[in-house]
Amino acid sequence: MPTFKLVLSDPLSGKARQFEIKDPLAQRFVGLRIGEEIDGTVLKELIELPKGVKIRITGGSGVEGAPMHPGVPGPVKRYILADGPPGYRPRKRGMRKKKLVRGDTITDSIVQINAVLVYPEGYSGPPAIPLGAKELEKLKGGKTEEAAASQ
């Protein structure tokens, strides 16, 4: 019985939302690999997505905190000599380090799945994950209007 936290990012609004996914919906994600796309209607119970939107898996992390790595095939844990992301950011140029990473396939031992919305070409509607009240206020310049009204 897998349970995942899905972090869904929206490129139109620049926002991300986190969802808790339990069985039987979680079973649809088991076996998917990094880079694969699934239809957005899978999440119709959690979020209302526009027609034609797909969800692309971009990564995740396991129970122990090891990130999924697109260069490691299969549902495995491996030590790699990492020289850059994902999983390691070197302090100096040329530094490498032995790091534990997970493979590129989602299994029951994955805790978090990172994904991004892929809109159809020519989409001009509103973003699926809207901006919050503070962001809208910043865009409209609400703070300057309040300051002018108080003087």
From Swiss-Prot:
InterPro entries: Ribosomal_eS6, Ribosomal_eS6_arc, Ribosomal_eS6_CS
Signal sequence interval, chain numbering: none
Ribonucleoprotein recorded as keyword: yes
Pfam family, one: Ribosomal_S6e
Protein name, UniProt field: Small ribosomal subunit protein eS6
Lineage per the UniProt record: Archaea, Thermoproteota, Thermoprotei, Thermoproteales, Thermoproteaceae
GO-annotated biological processes: translation
Molecular function GO labels: structural constituent of ribosome
Record key words, sorted: Ribonucleoprotein, Ribosomal protein
Claim: Hydrolase is one of the keywords in the record: no
